[in-house]
Amino acid sequence: MTLTFRNDKPDDFLTILREVGQWLMDTNQEMWQLDTLTSDNLFDEYTCENCYVMYADQTPSATFILQWKDPLYYADVPDNTAGFIHKVAIRRQFSGQNLFAHILDFCRSECLTRSIHEIQLETDATRSALLRFYERHGFEPTYQKQIQEFGQSFLCQYCALRF
């Protein structure tokens, strides 16, 4: 399987994110409110050109945001000292194929080109299975913080991967 990453396909990005968001809702695992997954909400000065689509043999398969400044979730982290991952979504037809490991390899490589040696992410602190998934990929829990976004309140578990 040939994997490529593109940061110039916003329509593919939104399509995958909404598709995965709908599946999460249908299986009672809602992560995001579907009506918040819009270009107006997701594409801004911090995410522009940082919203990636992973293609598996030219088929759109996953999304993620890799940004270098994040005033909402990481206001206390100096710009360009960590890569911040958001909105990871892997299409169901690609589940179980270890695509997240490839996403992390790509993110590590992008970080290293900037002399950055840390990736941070945050997720819903109540999702123990998801937290274990991130820990299996090397992320260590760091702290929890309440966040407000798109009219919702979340208790976020922050995690870091250092390399």
Describe these PLM feature segments.
Residues 18-93, 101-106, 110, 162-163:
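Acetyl-CoA-dependent GNAT
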Residues 8, 88-90, 123:
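Hydrophobic adenine-recognition pocket in adenosine-nucleotide-binding enzymes
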